Structures are given as structure tokens and as C-alpha cells.
């Protein structure tokens, strides 16, 4: 499946920061270390030189990837007209058949982070949720079989886990 080119504004900024950090901070340090290691003589048995060159290749590969990727990514900001329906960037609280609640945020594939409960817009769950609204039922084909979710809440700002369900976090 093709990778979407959508990203949230904060996701784009994070990738841009990573690019600048690698290019302006980490690469010069590693380049200097490699230069110093090369000055020590025989490079064939010089572990610092060998591993430094390897790290430099990794940095250069990541820098090339980020530079190219940032050129094609499209920043998607929430639109007030989206309220009430699930679209890119939404935080969605769902409940499954076992009455277990889960929260997902629909983000671009470059932002996917299970620890944050951020799922790719290209994932089966996200594709099933797009365009739906509160009280809608969605069925998703997963590697473990079908999963059914009911949409309980949709937001375009983070949920506050410490507040009761459906309480507005601005209060």
C-alpha cells in the first residue's frame, strides 16, 4: 500500500528539527571524531574510525530521507467544520465488544507511535474510522480477526486521561 503524504503540523516540525539536529549538530561531531580516528594511523583495525564512518553513513542516509520526505509531505491542520466527524488528526475514543475503551489519534505514517496511541491514517482501523461520527459502529479486519468498535467521542485536541469521560478539558 502506498504511504500517505499527510502529516500534522507538529509532526512536520519534529521531522524538520530532527533534520537540522542531524545536519548541524550530530554530523559535525561525528565527522570530527572520524577525522581524529583517521589520524591515528591504520584504518583497517581502527574501531573508532570504522564505527564513526558507519554512523556517518547512517546520518547521511537519514538526512537524505528527511530532506526528500519533508518536500512531499502535506501539512493538514484541523478544520472547524470537521468537528463531530473523524478525519485526519482526530483523537477518537472507542469501545470494543468487551467494553474496553481505547483512544487513537489518526496521524500520518511518519508520525505513527503506538506508545502515544497514534495510528497511521493508512491503517485498517483509521480507514474504517474516517468520516464516521459518535455512536457509529465500525468493523475492522485485523490480523486476529474482525474487531468491532463503537465511537464514543471525537476531538481535535488531546484527551485528558485524568478527567471523567466527555468532560470538556477547557473547563
UniProtKB/Swiss-Prot annotation:
One Pfam family of this chain: GreA_GreB
Any single GO BP term: regulation of DNA-templated transcription elongation
Entries under SUPFAM superfamilies matching the protein: FKBP-like (SSF54534), GreA transcript cleavage protein, N-terminal domain (SSF46557)
GO MF annotations, alphabetized: DNA binding; RNA polymerase binding
UniProt xrefs under Gene3D superfamilies: Transcription elongation factor, GreA/GreB, C-terminal domain, Transcription elongation factor, GreA/GreB, N-terminal domain
Stretches assigned to coiled coil: 53-75
Source organism superkingdom: Bacteria
Keywords: Coiled coil, DNA-binding, Transcription, Transcription regulation
Functional description taken from the UniProt entry: Necessary for efficient RNA polymerase transcription elongation past template-encoded arresting sites. The arresting sites in DNA have the property of trapping a certain fraction of elongating RNA polymerases that pass through, resulting in locked ternary complexes. Cleavage of the nascent transcript by cleavage factors such as GreA or GreB allows the resumption of elongation from the new 3'terminus. GreB releases sequences of up to 9 nucleotides in length.
Similarity-based family: Belongs to the GreA/GreB family. GreB subfamily.
Protein name: Transcription elongation factor GreB
Organism in which the protein naturally occurs: Yersinia pestis
Gene that this polypeptide is encoded by: greB
Amino acid at each position: 500500500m502506498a504511504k500517505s503524504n499527510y502529516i500534522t503540523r507538529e509532526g512536520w516540525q519534529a521531522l524538520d528539527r530532527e533534520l537540522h539536529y542531524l545536519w548541524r549538530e550530530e554530523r559535525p561531531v561525528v565527522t570530527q571524531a572520524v577525522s581524529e580516528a583517521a589520524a591515528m594511523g591504520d584504518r583497517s583495525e581502527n574501531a573508532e574510525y570504522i564505527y564513526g564512518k558507519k554512523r556517518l553513513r547512517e546520518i547521511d542516509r537519514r538526512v537524505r530521507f528527511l530532506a526528500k520526505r519533508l518536500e512531499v509531505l502535506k501539512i493538514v491542520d484541523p478544520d472547524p467544520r470537521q468537528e463531530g466527524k473523524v478525519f485526519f488528526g482526530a483523537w477518537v475514543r472507542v469501545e470494543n465488544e468487551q467494553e474496553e475503551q481505547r483512544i487513537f489519534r489518526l496521524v500520518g505514517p511518519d508520525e505513527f507511535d503506538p506508545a502515544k496511541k497514534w495510528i497511521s491514517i493508512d491503517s485498517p482501523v483509521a480507514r474504517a474510522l474516517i468520516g464516521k461520527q459518535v455512536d457509529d459502529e465500525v468493523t475492522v479486519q485485523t490480523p486476529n480477526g474482525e474487531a468491532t468498535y463503537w465511537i464514543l467521542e471525537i476531538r481535535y485536541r488531546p484527551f485528558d486521561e485524568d478527567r471523567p469521560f466527555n468532560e470538556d478539558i477547557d473547563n
